[in-house]
Design a protein with these regions (language model features):
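Short coil/turn segments at beta-strand junctions that form active-site/ligand-binding loops
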Residues: 65, 94-96, 129
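Short linear functional motifs in flexible/disordered or boundary regions
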Residues: 10, 81, 112, 130-131
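Non-catalytic protein-protein interaction segments used by genome-maintenance enzymes to assemble
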Residues: 77-116, 120, 124-125
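Metal-dependent nuclease catalytic regions and adjoining charged, substrate-binding loops involved
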Residues: 37, 107, 120-144
Length: 144
C-alpha cells in the first residue's frame, strides 16, 4: 500500500480497506492461506500501512526529495542477469539516492540479501551517485 498511496494518514479507514481489498487476489487464495477472510486481511493491511505512515523516519525520507515507487530494473551482477522491483527510490540530494524496501513480519536473512542485490543494481544504474539502501519493517500492535 505504501507504493500505491504514499503517506496518506488523512484517508478514512473504510476507504483504505476498500483499496486494500482491490489489491488482493480475487480468488481469496491469500486469505485462505492464512485462515482469514479477505476483509480481515484488508484490515490487517490497513493497520500495517497506518503504522508505516506513522513512522517519523519514513516520513522524513519521503519529504527528502522526489520519489519513484515500484521501480523495475534489470542488471547484470557478477555475470548473472537480475530482475527486480525496488519498492521506493528517493532522490535525497544531488547525486544521492536512497532505496527503501518495505517488509512486514520479522527480519529474515533473505531480506538483507535482496536489499544488497538492489543496492548493487542501483549503483550500476546510477553511476556517480551515492546510494543508500534501507529495509523498513512495518510494525503494528498485535501484528507480526
Amino acid at each position: 500500500m505504501m507504493q500505491r498511496f504514499g503517506l496518506d494518514l488523512a484517508s478514512s479507514t473504510s476507504m483504505l480497506q476498500q483499496a486494500a481489498l482491490r489489491l488482493l487476489p480475487s480468488d481469496e487464495g491469500l486469505a485462505a492461506s492464512v485462515e482469514r477472510t479477505t476483509t480481515e486481511v484488508a484490515e490487517a493491511a490497513v493497520e500495517l500501512y497506518r503504522a508505516m505512515c506513522g513512522r517519523t523516519d519514513v516520513r522524513a525520507l519521503y519529504a527528502a526529495g522526489p520519489r519513484l515507487h515500484e521501480v523495475p530494473f534489470t542488471a547484470s551482477l557478477n555475470g548473472v542477469v537480475v530482475r527486480g522491483t525496488i519498492d521506493c527510490l528517493i532522490h535525497t540530494g544531488p547525486d544521492e539516492i536512497t532505496i527503501l524496501e518495505f517488509k512486514t513480519g520479522q527480519p529474515r536473512p533473505e531480506h538483507q540479501v535482496q536489499l544488497d542485490v538492489y543496492h548493487q543494481a542501483a549503483v550500476r544504474l546510477f553511476p556517480g551517485s551515492s546510494v543508500d539502501a534501507l529495509l523498513v519493517y512495518a510494525t503494528a500492535p498485535g501484528l507480526v
